Amino acid sequence: MVKIAFGSIGDSFSVASIKAYVAEFIATLLFVFAGVGSAIAYNKLTSDAALDPAGLVAVAVAHAFALFVGVSMAANVSGGHLNPAVTLGLAVGGNITILTGLFYWIAQCLGSTVACLLLKFVTNGLSVPTHGVAAGMDAIQGVVMEIIITFALVYTVYATAADPKKGSLGVIAPIAIGFIVGANILAAGPFSGGSMNPARSFGPAVASGDFSQNWIYWAGPLIGGALAGFIYGDVFITAHAPLPTSEDYA
């Protein structure tokens, strides 16, 4: 049974909810600053050479470490989503309301955009790399790739963080989430870029002014996240605690 709840304005603008939005903004900003910053640093060190295996590993590790830290720092305030696809997946499973989830999206996209604009400023106008599918691939292949890897990410979030039966496994949730993102970037980076995160792709698109393929990184991750939320949140988790009231973020 689908557990989606729309929510209310009162809950979405409670003090706890506003704190959650600020936490998502800050954590996403820091994650994207480190992740995109690693790609900019690679381009500078190699004079914009094509990404080689060592560079791919470096970028994947930077994203994995930064996400691990970002999720850890926001987990106790907002749940540590840092990603619209994660938020949607959790909404499909009834862990957050649609209305509050939309404000999470805004906070995440703003955090990513500010991070990329800051990077452009502090690097004296160096190019901010955007996600795009590799030569020889079409957009549909890129969408399917992003669906698969985002499904893996959100499924991991459910298994290690959202499942009420997780027990002590929840302690390692940020590590597991960082690991799956790093692994997926290693697998998908040369093909779709390995985004898994519409906000992560949106910020660079704003900073560079290039939205030509940005839709791929909304469609794929959101579909993958929703599928994972439905399968784990609505099929595997048969009982669900009521959504929190305005005393907590909704």
Curated annotation (Swiss-Prot):
Segments crossing the lipid bilayer: 20-42, 55-77, 97-119, 140-162, 172-194, 215-237
Subcellular locations according to the entry: Vacuole membrane
Organism domain of life: Eukaryota
Keywords on record: Membrane, Repeat, Transmembrane, Transmembrane helix, Transport, Vacuole
Renumbered ranges of motif NPA 2: 197-199
Topological type in the membrane: Multi-pass membrane protein
NPA 1 (motif): residue ranges: 83-85
GO CC terms: plant-type vacuole membrane
Tissue: Expressed in mature seeds and dark-grown seedlings.
GO terms of molecular function: water channel activity
Pfam families recorded: MIP
InterPro entries: Aquaporin-like, Aquaporin_transptr, MIP, MIP_CS
Major localisation: membrane
Domain notes: Aquaporins contain two tandem repeats each containing three membrane-spanning domains and a pore-forming loop with the signature motif Asn-Pro-Ala (NPA).
Family: Belongs to the MIP/aquaporin (TC 1.A.8) family. TIP (TC 1.A.8.10) subfamily.
Function: Channel protein in tonoplast. These proteins may allow the diffusion of amino acids and/or peptides from the vacuolar compartment to the cytoplasm.
Record protein name field: Probable aquaporin TIP-type
The organism of origin for this protein: Antirrhinum majus
Source organism phylogeny: Eukaryota, Viridiplantae, Streptophyta, Embryophyta, Tracheophyta
